[in-house]
Amino acid sequence: MKEFFRPVISNALHSAGITTDKQIIIEQPADKKFGDFSTNIALLAAKECRRNPRELAQTIIEHLSFPPDTIAKIEVAGAGFINFYLTPLFIMQSVEQVLLDGDEYGKGESGKGEKAIVEYVSANPTGPLTIGRGRGGVLGDCIANLFATQGYAVTREYYFNDAGRQMQILGESVRFRYLERCGETIEFPATHYQGEYIGEIAEELFNDHGTALADSTDVQIFKKRAEEIIFASIRKTLERLGIRHDSFFNEHTLYTPDAGGVTGNQRVIDALREKEFIAEYDGATWFLTTKLGQEKDKVLIKSSGEPSYRLPDIAYHITKYERGFGMIVNVFGADHIDEYPDVLEALKILGYDTRHIKIAINQFVTTTVDGQTLKMSTRKGNADLLDDLIDDVGADATRLFFIMRSKDSHLNFDVELAKKQSKDNPVFYLQYAHARICSLLRMAQQEIGFDATSSPELHLLQRLTSPAELQLGSALLDYPDMIKTSLRLLEPQKMVEYLHSLAECFHRFYQECPILKAEPDIARARLFLSVATRQVLRNGFRILGVSAPESM
């Protein structure tokens, strides 16, 4: 809908002789008394035009030319905002389009022909998924859904960290528990994984092999079994939340030599060395980030010979370019904030265009139960497990609570609130709006034979002119722009806020506008408006990955 205004305003600027390099920004006022749409272009352009913003706004209005029956009123407000009020006819004609488009309403083609890769979760297979990892998983899944709505060919990838020191520690942890099961006395290291699941994996190995592995010093046997069992558990947990991946990239491939005998990690070192950004000192290999203005260089290969996280991350991103992805999206936890800029700098040095890399950092999660905050530590074995949360509140509440706050904000997951069957629970509130409409339509079919698929009757919508009807209709028109905003910001929370506002509009409409008791044509028109609302709720729920119950 915002694209409806931009060319008209641009033409008005041109015909009025107003030259500006400022972008035409169209906003949707939260309070509809300030219009259905608004622009601050007069405020932005006033300084370079050396004119009073309100006077400039009035000049722009005088040169606006909209199609007939679309704009009811245009006014200058405040310091120089231009507010636009849509006609009831235009609003309801647009609602007709919602019904005609159905599941396709809100989708676009801005990404048509483009390949996008969204990487998310990518948890080390060292233990069951924690609640913190779950937030990133839901965020990534929703972001991938948003890209898909705009025509991108989306690949959902899990970076499978099956190499590195943590996996070695995992194997050692299982081996120690296995030796204990064999009857040996072991001083279990405090630095290793303590959870009960380690003992359960060791028990499986003992059941399969007895004491035959007791003399083996090959940690890989234990690591491999642990990796298989834990990753199967991770995938099962993700499936419970409706989180899927199309591709699993194994980190060990970056350590595997190609036909020429060179690993992906080594190619990065060689390429950076050629650019004179590599040095060896203190027994380690360093990325010379001091040449980029940073205070310290960053280690790529430790003195132990083990790569730091930065090196395989750089090599991994190069594979994304090599696979032809024009849009690269990474969903990370807050623990990646310090590391990731170095990865981008390395890619720039090596000649890769990083403008098409988007990063979504999600902050930490704490879980509150009866006012008590739970602690999380996979290593110590007292992790706050994602499976337990799903068992407690369900998949829908888990997903929606993870994204109902900005990804940039710390999230306090209130378990008791998530289980409430009242309007205080945002999940219940949204789903109840959908269920309420479904119940209404069942009654309408029984009492007046209403057919929600009857396209020839859609013109009846144009008879709706009350404030509650127009507010709901106008809210439905905001949906396509809200998808684009959520995608641009990589912020599904915006979609949650929009759907909550839409549900509020519907509940107000339901209270103020009698439906089945209205005169026949008005009743059918209001029912069509309800069907359109149900459609937009469903479309939004599909992006967020939550169910749309027909009864509650």
Swiss-Prot record:
GO terms for molecular function: arginine-tRNA ligase activity; ATP binding. It is found in: Cytoplasm. Keywords: Aminoacyl-tRNA synthetase, ATP-binding, Cytoplasm, Ligase, Nucleotide-binding, Protein biosynthesis. The keyword Metal-binding does not apply. GO terms for biological process: arginyl-tRNA aminoacylation. Pfam families: Arg_tRNA_synt_N, DALR_1, tRNA-synt_1d. It catalyses: tRNA(Arg) + L-arginine + ATP = L-arginyl-tRNA(Arg) + AMP + diphosphate. GO terms for cellular component: cytoplasm. The keyword Cell cycle does not apply. Its EC number is 6.1.1.19. InterPro entries: Arg-tRNA-ligase, Arg-tRNA-synth_N, Arg-tRNA-synth_N_sf, ArgRS_core, DALR_anticod-bd, Rossmann-like_a/b/a_fold, tRNAsynth_Ia_anticodon-bd. Belongs to the class-I aminoacyl-tRNA synthetase family. Monomer. This is Arginine--tRNA ligase. It comes from Pelodictyon phaeoclathratiforme (strain DSM 5477 / BU-1). The gene is argS.
